[in-house]
């Protein structure tokens, strides 16, 4: 035995190195239990979410999502076609508007030309009427002068014959 003058009591070596409170084995046991509990919780959550993912509601949701995606794609395609059609229609409308403007300008020119031609025709008709009147006046004057000449021509002939007869009488 050891001498009695040591100030501490003799302790066994394996007790001396163990920490006070919980031992290392207990910590490992607690850690293992926690790992198992966490594993069980994770497995339960995975099973729950797997069931939820394969449920009818989820399948219907996925099917509806696919239908919505397809419908959206179809609507986008139809919108693109409608926009292209609208653009083409606008271009045709612009072309038609330009054609209408050109035709309107052309019509205004034709109306102006027609009015000028009608004014010229009216002027020429007036001139023709005036010339016809002058022609009628000249015909009337010619008839009058022809009648006068015929009348005066007959009296000239008669007077010429009388002079000739008188000269012949006087001569013989």
UniProtKB/Swiss-Prot annotation:
> What does the entry state regarding organ or tissue expression?
Ubiquitously expressed, with highest levels in brain and liver. Present in liver (at protein level).
UniProt-recorded Gene Ontology molecular function terms: identical protein binding; metalloendopeptidase inhibitor activity; protein homodimerization activity
Recite the UniProt keywords alphabetically: Cell membrane, Coiled coil, Cytoplasm, Disulfide bond, Endosome, Glycoprotein, Golgi apparatus, GPI-anchor, Immunity, Innate immunity, Isopeptide bond, Lipoprotein, Membrane, Signal-anchor, Transmembrane, Transmembrane helix, Ubl conjugation
- Organism expressing this protein natively: Rattus norvegicus
Main subcellular location? Golgi
* TM ranges: 27-47
Q: How does this protein lie in the membrane? A: Single-pass type II membrane protein; Lipid-anchor; GPI-anchor
Q: Print the domain comment field.
A: The extracellular coiled coil domain forms an extended 170 A long semi-flexible rod-like structure important for virion retention at the cell surface and prevention of virus spreading.
Q: What does this protein do?
A: IFN-induced antiviral host restriction factor which efficiently blocks the release of diverse mammalian enveloped viruses by directly tethering nascent virions to the membranes of infected cells. Acts as a direct physical tether, holding virions to the cell membrane and linking virions to each other. The tethered virions can be internalized by endocytosis and subsequently degraded or they can remain on the cell surface. In either case, their spread as cell-free virions is restricted.
Q: Record's Gene Ontology CC terms?
A: apical plasma membrane; cell surface; cytoplasm; Golgi apparatus; membrane raft; multivesicular body; plasma membrane; side of membrane
Q: Find the cross-link Glycyl lysine isopeptide (Lys-Gly) (interchain with G-Cter in ubiquitin).
A: 20
Q: Which residues form the propeptide?
A: 153-172
Residues assigned to the Extracellular compartment are 48-152
* Name the UniProt record assigns to this protein: Bone marrow stromal antigen 2
PANTHER family xrefs: BONE MARROW STROMAL ANTIGEN 2
Q: What do we know about how this protein assembles, alone or with others?
A: Parallel homodimer; disulfide-linked. May form homotetramers under reducing conditions. Isoform 1 and isoform 2 form homodimers and also heterodimers with each other. Dimerization is essential for its antiviral activity. Interacts (via cytoplasmic domain) with ARHGAP44. Interacts with MMP14 (via C-terminal cytoplasmic tail). Interacts with LILRA4/ILT7. Interacts with RNF115.
- List the lineage, top down: Eukaryota, Metazoa, Chordata, Craniata, Vertebrata
What are the BP-aspect GO terms?
Answer: defense response to virus; innate immune response; negative regulation of cell growth; negative regulation of cell migration; negative regulation of intracellular transport of viral material; negative regulation of plasmacytoid dendritic cell cytokine production; negative regulation of viral genome replication; regulation of actin cytoskeleton organization
Its post-translational modification remark reads:
N-glycosylated.
Which residues lie toward the Cytoplasmic compartment? 1-26
Residues carrying the lipid (GPI-anchor amidated serine) are 152
InterPro entries in the record: BST2
Coiled-coil spans are: 103-149
Subcellular location per the Swiss-Prot or TrEMBL entry = Golgi apparatus, trans-Golgi network; Cell membrane; Late endosome; Membrane raft
Q: Which SUPFAM superfamilies does the UniProt entry name for this protein?
A: Sec2 N-terminal region
The entry annotates sugar attachment on 70, 97
């Amino acid at each position: 035995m050891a001498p009695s003058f040591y100030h501490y009591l003799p302790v066994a070596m394996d007790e001396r190195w163990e920490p006070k409170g919980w031992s290392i084995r207990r910590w490992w046991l607690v850690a293992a239990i926690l790992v198992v509990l966490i594993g069980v919780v994770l497995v339960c959550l995975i099973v729950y979410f797997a069931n939820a993912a394969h449920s009818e509601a989820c399948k219907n949701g996925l099917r509806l999502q696919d239908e919505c995606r397809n419908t959206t794609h179809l609507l986008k395609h139809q919108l693109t076609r409608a926009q292209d059609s609208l653009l083409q229609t606008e271009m045709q409308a612009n072309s038609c508007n330009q054609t209408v403007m050109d035709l309107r300008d052309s019509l205004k020119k034709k109306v102006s030309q027609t009015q000028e031609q009608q004014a010229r025709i009216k002027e020429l008709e007036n001139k023709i009427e005036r010339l016809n009147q002058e022609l009628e006046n000249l015909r009337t004057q010619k008839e009058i002068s022809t009648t006068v000449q015929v009348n005066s021509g007959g009296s000239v002939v008669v007077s010429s014959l009388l002079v000739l007869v008188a000269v012949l009488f006087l001569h013989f």
